[in-house]
A protein has these predicted regions:
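Right-handed parallel beta-helix/beta-solenoid
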Residues: 54-59, 70-79, 91-103, 114-124, ...
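Extracellular beta-solenoid/beta-roll
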Residues: 37, 45, 49-51, 260, ...
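Membrane translocator/pore-forming domains, dominated by Gram-negative outer-membrane beta-barrels
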Residues: 188, 224, 257-259, 269, ...
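Glycine- and acidic/polar-rich repeat regions and solenoidal domains
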Residues: 147-156, 209-210, 214-223, 227-231, ...
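Beta-strand-rich solenoid/repeat architectures in extracellular/passenger domains
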Residues: 37, 43-49, 53-62, 66-68, ...
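A generic tandem-repeat structural signature
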Residues: 84-132, 598-636
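Gram-negative bacterial Sec-dependent N-terminal signal peptides
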Residues: 1-34, 612
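Outer-membrane translocation/initiation segment of Type V secreted surface proteins
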Residues: 3-4, 377, 388, 405-574, ...
Length: 798
């Protein structure tokens, strides 16, 4: 929004030219030389004497680069360019205009006093300075005003003076004997219209702009601030003082700034106590500007209304105190910094009311609410019913539709009954409030629910919740009924878990499984042999975990690449020592069967390790130690991505013994029982989520075991290659706990302690020294646990 186009920046040149022509060629009045002009013309240039001037009866004074003392003009015209005007004598102002006087000034400095715009006078300032400093004042002086717009007792109405203040600095100090109504004011208006534009800056020791409704004021006083700044010292940026019924129209636009020394952007009160009968109206519009401060209406002493509108991406960070009506729309925002009250609140499409910043909890009280698609933003310490929260209290009716967004202010999440009350409606509850985004605390998901009493609550469970009259029959909305026989209590619905909790659990499970492998995974099925071996192995696994609390469905996909090589052999090749490295990754999905929301978990990392084994004829013993580091991520719908790191030590001890059980043709069959123990020591960073939830691992270390039986055949192909198919059954017993604590409330995945696997595959060893083996397997467990895996390995002996 603009008050004026660029063509208005210096409209004074054409009138000036016309005035000069009229004065020099058409007027029969002679040119005056100094002091007083009565229907005459004078020019002051650099080096001319510094004098006071008094103009009457359509006189014209031109000051070009010169300096004067106080100038007073009635029904006359002034043009100042690169000039200086000093307040002199006992005058209160540097320039005083009355009647139909006009002042046009460019790059001029006014010292010691301001400009007085009386009656129907007009002022246009471009790139000027009005400077009133303490050293410019006389002892006992009470009046220091940059620009004053008022009326003179001797003049007749109408009083419709105008001032356009363009790219000008106004700096005003307090008077030695200050008065709130007359000292340290950048602008004081009792009539007319003032436009403050194009980077103008007002720095006032008291109030930046004072609009004063007196018994002699005009019915409407208008103030426009466009791309400019008003800064006050001890008072409000803008003050409206009401002593008689008046309408005040104030617009702040295009990146303007208001800085109130007392914390008020706008203060509406009275100056002299009782106000004359009748209502005053203050219309305060903020357009495409961001302001910080309060809007305060002294409704106890002033009769009327304060109507506030935010539009075109405007924002106010502050309190609204006794505001009659507020309209927030067009991508505009009101960020409350404390409790506020508004008569009628209209929240338009794209508008936002943020009830707080999360550092404290605020209450907004309104008489009527109308929603047209805007958003209410609440900060809530998500927990049980008693949780602290921002709150909207509607004393009257609520109509329309509005969105609700909830930010968790450090709540750990908890089970709710009736819920956390966000919106209290005293009248007709006809409005629809819809939760946008997600409200999550700890491991729980919260939902916005309308209760039977018409109020709106956050609940961590689905369903309508318990009947409040059953919980507490003494509530005011409950109608007494005859007692009935007691019935068994109804279990409240369980709280709703958020899917991110499942993603954390899935990541923990995946990391625990990343490095696990057996002797046969490295060795294949070969017996001990001379020589050094290098080997490589890839595998992929898909796991489906049991639903967490019958709500979260978890699926985990893992893959890894392992590389290793022997670095030494002993005992005639029966024993060998080697090193190995692992690169692994996991991708998990957690989906809520209740809400439909989902989250993804990812784990990426690697490990280095050493191994050693000894094998002779039918027996083998194997041991390994690995250390891994992993990067973890969790991404929920509509939530910020969470990142954290983990470290893992894992050691394994394994042994097996082979029994020959016969032949099928030329293939020898053997049966090998195996036993393996795995110890895991995992350290996961304590992570604080963006919403404040503290997440830590609980019980991700411990001892696990495997007992297996392997049926293997050994034969040779026509080309002389050794072929060894196998079939294996394994029983896995997990001793390590699996759990994640969300703000100290532990949630566990449904990973069965006992799992059972069947696998099959084959190994082929060629005469050239190459060998390859691979296989696939399936695993089952309680609670619907399922897993499928496939692997392929290559080795070379030299």
């Amino acid at each position: 929004m603009r008050f004026h186009t660029n063509d208005d920046r210096l409209p004074l040149m054409r009138p000036l030219a016309r005035s000069l022509l009229a004065a020099l060629f058409l007027s029969p009045i002679s040119v005056a030389l100094a002091g007083e002009l009565d229907g005459g013309f004078a020019r002051v240039s650099s080096g001319d004497p510094v004098e006071e001037w008094r103009l009457i009866n359509e006189s014209f004074l031109q000051v070009l680069g010169g300096e004067t003392n106080t100038i007073s003009a009635t029904d006359s015209e002034l043009y100042l360019e690169y000039a200086s005007v000093n307040r002199s004598g006992h005058n209160q102002h540097a320039v005083a205009l009355a009647g139909d006087a006009r002042l046009q000034a460019l790059s001029t400095t006014f010292r010691g006093g301001g400009i007085h715009v009386n009656d129907r006078a007009y002022v246009h300032l471009v790139d000027n300075q009005i400077l009133i400093a303490p050293e410019d004042m006389r002892p006992g002086e009470r009046l220091t005003i940059g620009i004053e717009m008022s009326y003179s007792a001797a003049s007749a109405p109408p009083f419709n003076g105008k001032a356009r203040i363009d790219s000008t600095l106004i700096r005003v100090a307090d008077a030695p004997d200050p008065r709130d109504i007359s000292s340290g004011l950048g602008l004081r208006m009792t009539h007319g219209q003032a436009d403050i534009v194009n980077g103008t800056r007002i720095e006032a020791a008291n109030v930046g702009a004072l609009l004063w409704g007196t018994r002699h004021a005009t019915p409407v006083i208008q103030l426009g601030i466009d791309g400019s700044t008003i800064q006050s010292g001890r008072g409000a940026a803008i003050r409206v003082a009401v002593d008689a019924p008046t309408q005040f129209d104030i617009t702040v636009a295009n990146g303007s700034q208001l800085e109130g020394g007392d914390g008020n952007l706008l203060l509406v009160n009275t100056e002299n106590g009782p106000v004359l009968p009748g209502d005053s109206t203050v219309n305060f519009t903020v357009d495409d500007s961001r302001l910080a401060g309060n809007v305060t209406f002294d409704a106890a002493n002033v009769s009327g209304s304060v109507n506030l509108a935010l539009r075109n991406k405007a924002q106010i960070d502050g309190r609204f105190i006794n505001v009659t009506s507020a309209s927030i729309d067009s991508d505009s925002t009101w960020l409350m910094t404390g409790d506020s009250n508004v008569g009628a609140l209209t929240l338009g499409a794209g508008g936002t009311v943020a009830l707080g910043s999360g550092s404290s909890f605020n209450t907004l009280t309104v008489d009527e609410f109308t929603g047209n698609g805007g958003t209410l933003l609440f900060n809530t310490h998500l927990g049980d019913d008693s949780s602290a929260t921002d709150k909207l209290v509607i004393n009257g009716d609520a109509n329309g539709q509005a969105n609700v967004r909830v930010l968790n202010a450090g709540g750990a999440g908890a089970k709710t009954d009736r819920g956390i009350e966000l919106i209290d409606i005293g009248g007709a509850s006809n409005a629809q409030f819809d939760l946008v985004g997600r409200a999550v605390g700890g491991q729980y998901e919260y939902f916005l629910v309308k209760d039977a009493n018409g109020n709106w609550y956050l609940r961590s469970q689905t369903g309508a919740g318990p009947d409040p009259c059953v919980v507490d029959p003494t509530l005011p909305e409950c109608t007494p009924i005859d007692p009935v026989d007691p019935v068994d209590p109804i279990e409240p619905p369980p709280p709703i878990l958020r899917p991110e909790a499942g993603a954390y659990l899935a990541n923990q499970f995946a990391m625990d499984q990343m490095l696990r492998h057996t002797y046969r995974d490295r060795q294949g099925g070969a017996a001990a042999a001379d020589g050094i071996r290098g080997w490589a192995r890839v595998d992929a696994t898909q796991s489906k975990l049991g639903a967490v609390d019958d709500q979260l469905d978890l699926r985990v996909d893992r893959s890894r690449l392992q590389l290793g090589a022997d670095i030494g052999v002993f005992d005639d090749g029966r024993g060998r020592i080697g090193v190995m490295g692992t690169a692994a990754r996991s991708s998990a999905t957690s989906r809520s069967d209740v809400t439909g929301f989902s989250a993804r978990g990812k784990v990426e990392g690697g490990a280095l390790g050493v191994y050693g084994n000894w094998a002779k004829d039918a027996m083998y013993v194997d041991a390994s130690v690995q250390r891994g580091q992993f990067r973890n991520r969790v991404q929920g719908e509509g939530l910020a991505e969470e990142r954290y790191d983990s470290d893992l030590w894992q050691s394994s001890l394994e042994a097996g013994y082979r029994f020959g059980i016969g032949h099928i043709g030329t293939t020898a069959l053997s049966l090998r029982p195996e036993l393996q123990l795995v110890y895991t020591d995992a350290k996961t960073d304590v992570h604080t989520e963006t919403n404040g939830t503290v997440v830590r691992a609980a019980g991700d270390s411990g001892l696990s075991g495997r007992a297996g039986l392997r049926l293997q055949g050994e034969g040779h192909s026509a080309e002389g290659a050794s072929v060894s198919p196998y079939l294996a059954a394994n029983w896995y017993r997990d001793g390590a706990g699996n759990g994640i604590a969300f703000d100290d409330e532990v949630l566990k995945a449904r990973i069965p302690r006992n799992r059972y696997e069947l696998s099959a595959g084959a190994r082929v060893e060629f005469r050239s020294g190459f060998s390859a083996w691979g296989g696939f397997g399936v695993m089952r467990g309680d609670s619907g646990y399922r897993e499928a895996t496939a692997n392929l390995s290559l080795a070379y002996k030299w």
